From Swiss-Prot:
Belongs to the RNA 3'-terminal cyclase family. Type 1 subfamily. Transmembrane segments: none annotated. This is RNA 3'-terminal phosphate cyclase. Its EC number is 6.5.1.4. It comes from Saccharolobus islandicus (strain Y.N.15.51 / Yellowstone #2) (Sulfolobus islandicus). ATP binds at Q101, H282, M283, S284, D285. One of its GO terms (molecular function) is RNA-3'-phosphate cyclase activity. GO terms for cellular component: cytoplasm. Its main location: cytoplasm. SUPFAM superfamilies: EPT/RTPC-like (SSF55205).
Length: 337
């Protein structure tokens, strides 16, 4: 059984999520202890338990310690169950997108359909539009297709969002994403839920003003939804090159002007573009598991402590050689033995 110190490195929920994903894919059980030991509210929280529950449902796993506040978890996976429908509610503050990241690599070609309720656009995790515009599009480039249906949006603290992820199929193989290539267009989605439509327009116009100096077409659409459970706004952007995609997002909050939201996302996008990386700081972390599973290399925007921690967990499950060089940007290469 693989032993994992949950306080290692950045010591957050990503250690658990990566472990769950790779445990199911490899069939290797693990024990994680000191879960989130250095955080203000240590131990498993509700959103972490839903990741455990989802993976348990998919693989009929045996578990011990899967309860709120637990600082230790044992997870013993069995065979992944195909042709499965799973419904889950990760709570008002729970991130739908973090669940998608955890589950998706493990259900490729398994005919699993998952309905997730919770927060689609919440702090400290990628927004659902980033997942649609960037994450899923880059996965398509490496041979993985997935259908995502955004039924309702959910913002902190009320939640109420709903997403279906299904038809996750493909034949991924070794890949090389070492440059963005010539920038061709910037796409985006500016949204509001149960707020005036002009907020989405102002976010969009603010981002467009800053991005116009890049000299490429800009296509930002607005998504205005009234009558949602939660109120909120945000914008996600994707700079599409001939070979890869760089993304960024920003969320509104009380007291934060719509123009600031749009400007923030645009400046994050430009900062990532200026690193000359092939993928942005979010995707630098998320692509690592796919590169490690199939053999791949890419240039990430920044080697964060989060990415470094992820790398060390991956090496516990997979017999691979990882070469990393640089910091901002960094080059990641995984070779499968």
């Amino acid at each position: 059984m693989i032993e994992i110190d949950g306080s290692f490195g950045e010591g957050g929920g990503q250690i658990l999520r990566t472990s769950l994903t790779l445990s199911i894919i490899t069939g290797k059980p693990f024990r994680i202890f000191n879960i989130r030991a250095n955080r203000p509210n240590p131990g498993l929280q509700r959103q972490h338990l839903w990741a455990v529950k989802a993976m348990k449902m998919i693989s009929n796993a045996e578990t011990k310690g899967d309860e709120v506040g637990s600082k230790e978890l044992i997870f013993v996976p069995h065979e992944i169950k195909g042709n499965t429908n799973i419904d889950m509610d990760v709570g008002t503050a729970g991130s739908v997108t973090l669940i998608i990241q955890t589950v998706l690599p493990a259900i490729i070609n398994k005919n699993v359909r998952i309905r997730i309720k919770g927060g689609t656009d919440v702090p400290k995790s990628p927004t659902i539009d980033y997942i649609r515009l960037v994450y899923l599009e880059i996965l398509r480039k490496i041979g993985i297709e997935a259908k995502l249906n955004l039924i309702k949006r959910g913002h902190y603290p009320e939640g109420g969002g709903e997403v279906i992820i299904e038809n996750v199929n493909g034949n991924p193989s070794a890949f090389s994403l070492l440059e963005l290539g010539k920038l061709t267009i910037i796409k985006g989605i500016s949204h509001v839920s149960s707020l005036p439509a002009h907020i989405a327009e102002r976010q969009m116009n603010s981002a467009r003003e800053i991005l116009s100096k890049l000299g490429v077409p800009i296509e930002i659409e607005t998504d205005v939804r009234q009558g949602e459970v939660s109120k909120g706004s945000g914008i996600a952007l994707a700079a599409i090159g001939e070979k890869s995609i760089i993304g960024a997002d920003s969320l509104g909050e009380r007291g934060k002007r719509a123009e600031i939201v749009g400007e923030e996302a645009a400046r994050i996008l430009i900062n990532n573009l200026n690193t000359k990386a092939s993928v942005d700081i979010h995707m630098s972390d998320m692509l690592m598991i796919f590169a490690s599973l199939y053999g791949g290399e890419y240039i990430g925007a920044e080697l964060t402590s989060h990415a470094y921690t992820n790398m060390e967990i991956i090496k516990k499950f997979l017999d691979i050689k990882i070469d990393v060089s640089g910091k901002r940007p960094f080059r990641f290469k995984a070779k499968i033995f």
